[in-house]
Amino acid sequence: MDFESFFKNELDGLHQEGRYRVFADLARHRGSFPKATRYTADGAQEVTVWCSNDYLGMGQCPIVTEAMKNAIDECGAGAGGTRNISGTNHYHVLLERELADLHGKESALLFTSGYVSNWAALGTLCSKIPGVIVFSDAGNHASMIEGIRHSKCERVIFKHNSVADLEAKLAAADPRAPKIIAFESVYSMDGDIAPIREFCDLADKYGAMTYLDEVHAVGMYGPRGGGIAEREGLMHRLTVIEGTLGKAFGVMGGYITGSAALCDFIRSFASGFIFTTALPPALAAGALASIRHLKESQVERFAHQERVRRLRSLLDQRGIPHMVNPSHIVPVIVGDAAKCKWISDLLLDNFGIYVQPINYPTVPKKTERLRITPTPMHSDADIDHLVSALHSLWSRCALARAVA
């Protein structure tokens, strides 16, 4: 087989469909977020970033960066091993305690990313529990899907956020089989929120475990930043709450929280935890500082919500089509892969606005979009400039002014 030709042909297909991903070469500057410098073959350009998952700008917060610098001075750079073989630093232990407290659980377990935490935890639960059936929301993240698929357990996909469809599928399943209901709180592409209470009611009725991914909600919602489940007073009803340290907390890593026995079970059987080097102590120290701060401070969350409201209001005034949802994610619908990429390129090249186009397979075809994520650091002028640029490009492209 001519492997090189195969690789190139596959890539050519992505180019032709407008789905080839181009990474923006950015240098973020401490203290000036969301501004950054973009590097191209033509030189450097100052841009405003509108698609960061550092939702609250905590990755630039002096509380976090100072904690990380101090940890490097104290501990050095790397963890030095797996968690089992000399790699457990005291910062890991403190961070796991803080995460367990955040979600009202007995225990927590750190992973190297949110992807790995989902893949390893779900893969282990679904492969080790005899005869388990996992009921997975159709909108679940790739990390959850891959973990479930890797386990080779029986899986049932229910319609996205549909309480009725989930109940129908639970009722049709073997009543003797152990069951797991796996879903997210805030879905990253549409920004919609799961009916957590109703799913917990079904879990109680049918004797199922619940597995909730809160990666786009931790730090953002609830009086202490514990996510949607904390805001709704439902943390105690969930078996596993999974989250990330790389979005609102501004650092890197993933985790699960649950009972002491469950976390110890994952710790002892999950290959994605056992056979990898632990997070550097500085990352754990930064995440610890970020979580402690956001447990006490509402300033960042309130400012963030105000920025989201202002952006949505101005988009409405200009007739720019965005999906209405109850979260902080603002999807502006284009509906065509090539046009979505073209608009993103024009925003970057002509207006200094960086918004990454979101195309298939991340979202279904004909729903291509710009996924905009305001932060507390975006000024009124930043928002005005973005909306004005979108208005200009929508007119040039003769795009629809409403979400179908």
From Swiss-Prot:
Protein name: 5-aminolevulinate synthase
A GO MF term: 5-aminolevulinate synthase activity
Binding site for pyridoxal 5'-phosphate: 188, 216, 244, 276-277
Modification N6-(pyridoxal phosphate)lysine, positions: 247
Family membership noted in the UniProt record: Belongs to the class-II pyridoxal-phosphate-dependent aminotransferase family.
Active site (record annotation): 247
UniProt-listed NCBIfam families: 5aminolev_synth
Protein keywords: Acyltransferase, Heme biosynthesis, Pyridoxal phosphate, Transferase
Listed cofactors: pyridoxal 5'-phosphate
Keyword Acyltransferase: yes
Pfam families reported in the protein's UniProt record: Aminotran_1_2
Reaction catalysis annotation: succinyl-CoA + glycine + H(+) = 5-aminolevulinate + CO2 + CoA
Gene Ontology biological process terms from the UniProt entry: protoporphyrinogen IX biosynthetic process
EC number in record: 2.3.1.37
Family annotation (PANTHER family): 2-AMINO-3-KETOBUTYRATE COENZYME A LIGASE, MITOCHONDRIAL, CLASS II AMINOTRANSFERASE/8-AMINO-7-OXONONANOATE SYNTHASE
Functional pathway: Porphyrin-containing compound metabolism; protoporphyrin-IX biosynthesis; 5-aminolevulinate from glycine: step 1/1
Subunit structure: Homodimer.
Gene3D superfamilies listed in its UniProt record: Aspartate Aminotransferase, domain 1, Type I PLP-dependent aspartate aminotransferase-like (Major domain)
Binding site for substrate: 21, 136, 362
